[in-house]
Structures are given as C-alpha cells and as structure tokens.
Amino acid sequence: MKLFYSPGACALSPHIVLLEAGLPFTIEKTDLRTKKTETGSDYYAVNSKGTVPALQLDDGRVLTEGPAIVQYLADQKPDSGLAPRAGTFERYQLMEILNYITSEVHKGYSPLFNPKISADWKASALANLGKKLDWLSGFLGGGKAFLMGTTFTVADAYLYTVLRWSEHVGIDLEKWPVLTAYRSRVGQRPKVQEALKAEGLAK
C-alpha cells in the first residue's frame, strides 16, 4: 500500500493508523499547491479531487477520504482494537464520532487557514469552533483516556491530527485542559511519534 500525504495535513491520521496496525506501506509526499507528488507524478491521476489522503492499494485501486481509509485499515487488522467489529453497535458509535470530527471539527478549522479571511469572519469561525471544542471536552471528560473509552482507535488518530492545527490558526488549546491533556497523551504514543518524524514534524 502507498499513502499519499502532505506533512501535517489530515493524511497524518491514516499514517498513524498504518503504523499502529503494523501494516506494510510506503508514503509519497504530495505538494497540494502544484498537485505533484515527490516523484514528479500528477497527483490528479491518483486522486481527481486533488486532496489528501489517498491510499493506493497493491492492486492499484485507490481509496480517498480519511474516515473511509482509517476504517478500511482497521478492518485489515481486526484484532488491533483500532475499530470495533463491523456490524456492532460500537462500530456505529465510532462512525458517529468520526463523522462529527470531519463535519464539525475539521470543517471548523478549515476557514482559519485562509489568509484572506476577514476579521469578522475569523471571529465567527473561532466562536463556532469553540463550541465544538467545548463539546469534545465534555465528551472526553470524566477520566476518558480516549474517544471510545480505554482503547485507542482510529478516531483518536483523526482528532489528534486536527487538534495539532490549533496553534497554526490562533487557537489557544489551553482553554480546554481536557483536550490539551488528551493531545499530549495521544502524541506520546510511539507510533504517533514515528509518524510525526516520518513527515518531518518532529525530531
């Protein structure tokens, strides 16, 4: 398998999952501005959406969209604990939190990366995102180590990836001590550190 990524972008999530699952894979860096991969290939030929992540299987098929990719990877190693078994209620709970991260939290960060955003729009976007972070803080409160309880899952890889963007867009995550502790806890995992180093995000 080959994972197409851009350092620090949302492809970090499946990168972490690949390592946590112990699956064989390679990575190929992609420039999202030029839509060229580090080997000089046209990235649109891999993913016509032009976004990362994209996972190219050994048979040439390509899967895109982070939540779909991480569940596919978890299902390749069902005993890893990275996702509840398909068809169980717990699996639908995992899908619920993945959907929340992608449609509310990830989406909430996106406009803040726009350098042309107006002051009023930025203030509104920050306020809206703050409400999502409030909910996550409450959801993780009460001593939960991870989103699904005591077990690290693909949802944690995704939320960790998104929370890493906070300082880059002017969000002081210290306002949410539960989320700060959570991000630190996930970030200390050996495979998370390995992914960060591979993408040039840590020494």
How would you describe each model-predicted region?
Residues 32-33, 180, 200:
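Conserved beta-strand edge residues that scaffold enzyme active sites
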Residues 73, 89, 97-190:
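GST-like fold's C-terminal all-alpha helical module
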Residues 53-56, 147, 193:
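Short beta-strand(s) of the beta-wing in winged-helix/HTH DNA-binding folds
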Residues 35-37, 183, 203:
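Generic structural signal for helix capping and beta-alpha/helix-loop junctions
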Residues 119, 201-203:
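Carbohydrate-binding/catalytic loop surfaces
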Residues 85-86, 194-201:
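Short, flexible loop/turn segments with low-complexity composition
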